[in-house]
Amino acid sequence: VARLARQDSRQAGFTKELHNFSADILSALPPVFGDTHAPEDRLHEAAFLLADIGATMHPDHRSDIARQIVLRGPYSGADHPARIYLGLVTAIRYWRKFTPTDLETSALTPEQIDRAKTVALTIRLAAEFSGRTERILKRASLSVDDGKLVLTIQKRHQNLMSDGVRKRLGHLASQLNLEADIR
């Protein structure tokens, strides 16, 4: 998957920090690919590797093209449902309003589709906040506290907050049935 994503050193660092940024949230959710988180962890690692696959594509077509590349790309180790899941994460990562097609609804459970949305919205939030850079993403954390999805940012980096970040935090919080909070 890393080869497909044409990962460079900057993207490798962002992938690692994306895992750290999302770990508390995703590990707290019940598994949707079996009885343990192991299969999901592997899929999420792949989704994080693919997080920037559409970065250079035209914004009007980015979601569809990136999804098709993930669905049909030359990589091994992913069965059809896994590819479909990764394709859905990628599509929603680039277009929040992407509606699952018959392909997704026939191959994935409603819980898996819901999880794909959660992962994609987490990637969207992280990318918006950090500009897809490891050094900036390290300065924030995501957690759940008292019914709130909390984005904590180091005080000296509060100026990195934008309306776009607030909006994406709100979308993710809504997906998780939580209120958004910034600290």
PLM-predicted stretches and their roles:
Residues 74-75, 150, 169:
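Short, charged/polar low-complexity linear motifs in solvent-exposed/disordered segments
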Residues 148-165:
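A short interface-forming secondary-structure element
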Residues 160-179:
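Short, non-transmembrane amphipathic alpha-helical segments
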